[in-house]
Amino acid sequence: MNQGKIWTVVNPSVGLPLLLGSVTVIAILVHAAVLSHTTWFPAYWQGGLKKAA
């Protein structure tokens, strides 16, 4: 482990939830930004336009 000494400063029971929580928050923010600033992403989630028969 390259940065193994960090666990002598921060307890893993505190550090790991903070790390995973911050990654989750960043992922949600990126998805929200893409969803609100593009036109193709919401259409992709809706499955595109249905053609009339």
From Swiss-Prot:
Residues on Cytoplasmic side: 1-14
GO molecular function, one term: metal ion binding
Main location: membrane
UniProt-listed GO biological process terms: photosynthesis, light reaction
Topological relation to the membrane, as annotated: Single-pass type II membrane protein
Keyword annotations: Antenna complex, Bacteriochlorophyll, Cell inner membrane, Cell membrane, Chlorophyll, Chromophore, Light-harvesting polypeptide, Magnesium, Membrane, Metal-binding, Transmembrane, Transmembrane helix
Keyword Transmembrane helix annotated: yes
GO cellular component: organelle inner membrane; plasma membrane; plasma membrane light-harvesting complex
Chain ranges on the Periplasmic side, renumbered to this chain: 36-53
Transmembrane segments: 15-35
Residues that, per the record, bind a bacteriochlorophyll: H31
Keyword tRNA-binding: no
Signal peptide extent: none
Summary of the function given for this chain in its UniProt record: Antenna complexes are light-harvesting systems, which transfer the excitation energy to the reaction centers.
Family membership noted in the UniProt record: Belongs to the antenna complex alpha subunit family.
Subunit details: The core complex is formed by different alpha and beta chains, binding bacteriochlorophyll molecules, and arranged most probably in tetrameric structures disposed around the reaction center. The non-pigmented gamma chains may constitute additional components.
Protein's name according to its UniProt entry: Light-harvesting protein B-800/850 alpha chain
